Amino acid sequence: MKYQLTAMEARVIGCLLEKQVTTPEQYPLSVNGVVTACNQKTNREPVMNLSESEVQEQLDNLVKRHYLRTVSGFGNRVTKYEQRFCNSEFGDLKLSAAEVALITTLLLRGAQTPGELRSRAARMYEFSDMAEVESTLEQLASREDGPFVVRLAREPGKRESRYMHLFSGEVENPPAVTDMSNAADGDLQARVEALEIEVAELKQRLDSLLAHLGD
């Protein structure tokens, strides 16, 4: 995988991809615009608090690596930045609108289930149903120039597996939960419920005894 983004680089690129689609009238972004986007409290996981100098350093590095380019033409006294990460004129990475929406949401929020991705990516692309989300994820996971996402083992107690992007390197994938561990969890839950019932019965008997003594 030739893409190796740090967490801050992934946040910067994710923000530019997002704003290119959701607020095209404000795109490309100035340094201040990128700082604000990176530090948003909504649709970000984790929430970051990057300084202007930290963001500027990421922008400079990404420009050198040809993932971004500066825009400072006539009438633009402030340098602005636009992404060349995907779908640029001379770039190799070509993604559909659906793929851009999923990749952007993964860059901004980390590992997520298909259901979470569908709802969170809705401002960028309206998926017709869950089948379209899952088929797009599978395409990203099996592309010849990829893979760009990976399906993680399902977590205990969760109905859906999560997916994660691979633009920051390989993802540590925990082993799938075995039936034995599920059985152990079920046994523990049953024991806890039995103890709760026993405590409730003891409390009821104590209340009854205290009421009797009061008489």
UniProtKB/Swiss-Prot annotation:
Pfam families: DUF480. Coiled coil: none annotated. The keyword Lipid metabolism does not apply. This is UPF0502 protein YceH. Keywords: Acetylation. The lineage of its organism: Bacteria, Pseudomonadati, Pseudomonadota, Gammaproteobacteria, Enterobacterales. Belongs to the UPF0502 family. InterPro entries: DUF480, WH-like_DNA-bd_sf, WH_DNA-bd_sf. It comes from Escherichia coli O127:H6 (strain E2348/69 / EPEC). It comes from the Bacteria. The keyword Acetylation applies. The modification N6-acetyllysine is found at residue 80. Disulfide bonds: none annotated.
